[in-house]
Structures are given as structure tokens and as C-alpha cells.
Amino acid sequence: GSQFGKGKGQLIGVGAGALLGAILGNQIGAGMDEQDRRLAELTSQRALETTPSGTSIEWRNPDNGNYGYVTPSKTYKNST
């Protein structure tokens, strides 16, 4: 959304993109059970901590066959 338009048009594009993302994310999340969400959360944490930027890692629920991928776009390591 933010790549297109200028001024108010650009802001509308950003808002529309955020709204669409929220709607799609909510629909996807509604199809996930508690174990799916747990696996996705654990995989997200592992991806952020150990996976190089641009590398996808998969989570898969063996009970229902649901799966997904997490791809960090930029990773940082805290020196503390």
C-alpha cells in the first residue's frame, strides 16, 4: 500500500493494506486450533532467534495436517 500514491492517497493505501491484512489474518487464525497457534508461535520465536533473513521454516500439526511457514525478513542479534 505505501509504495503507491502520494500524500493522502498514499495514506489510504497504507490503511487499506493494513485492513486487508487484518481481515485475512483473522480469517486464517479462525481456522487454526490451539495447537496450531502454539506451533506457529514457537516456530516464529525460533525463526526470529536462529533463522537467517529470507529463510523459511515450517510448522506442521500432525493431528490435523495444518501447516504454515515463518520467514523472518530481518534478523538481529542482541549483544547482551
Swiss-Prot record:
It is a lipid-anchor. Its main location: membrane. Residues 47-80 are annotated as: Disordered. Transmembrane segments: none annotated. The keyword Translocase does not apply. It is found in: Cell outer membrane. It comes from the Bacteria. Residues 47-58 have a biased composition (Polar residues). Keywords: Cell outer membrane, Lipoprotein, Membrane. InterPro entries: Gly_zipper_2TM_dom (IPR008816). The keyword DNA-binding does not apply. One of its GO terms (cellular component) is cell outer membrane. Belongs to the rickettsiale 17 kDa surface antigen family. This is 17 kDa surface antigen. It comes from Rickettsia canadensis. The lineage of its organism: Bacteria, Pseudomonadati, Pseudomonadota, Alphaproteobacteria, Rickettsiales.
